Amino acid sequence: MHWIGRPNDLVGILSGKTRDKSEYLILCFHGEEGQFILPELAEDVYEENEHRSCFFGAAQVLQHAHLEGVHVVATGCTLGDKKLAEAFKHGKAESYIAPKDDVDGNASLLFVLMFMYELINNSSTKRTAFERAQAIDDETGLYQLFF
């Protein structure tokens, strides 16, 4: 678990500088219009050359992501945006899963739990685990699997 309190924390995870080796990266964020929402910091708190916006989108993912061998699951609203998914693909993610629209927070939790349960306990393929988690209800049905 990594706590993200500033843009450079997310950059460290996406770039691999502060990410432990893991097959799955679950990004639990709020999202809006296909961008991750980060805490807004006071100007004097930002580090030199740090991204200065509470929105972190496809352009920033393109700039920083090095995700070879990692499957990414993002739980925030609208993070299933095609441009964002393409940015993760460009960063060499094995796959990207996220909701295409505003999604209920409880549904996001349930989706991730069911997806991981299917992978771990039932040795399901990624596709089968995704389909079972997506099929729970209309809210979990908002999740999309890219590449």
What annotation goes with each model-predicted range?
Residues 108-120:
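Short, small-residue alpha-helix embedded
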Residues 45-109:
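Catalytic cores of nucleophile-dependent amide-cleaving enzymes
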Residues 1-6, 98-103, 131:
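A generic structural motif
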Residues 23-43, 91-96:
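Active-site microenvironments of hydrolase-like enzyme catalytic domains
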Residues 8-9, 31-35, 78-81, 103-104:
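Short acidic, S/G/P-rich loop/turn micro-motifs used as interaction or catalytic elements
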Residues 2-3, 25-27, 73, 96-98:
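A structural signal for short, well-ordered beta-strand segments and their strand-loop junctions
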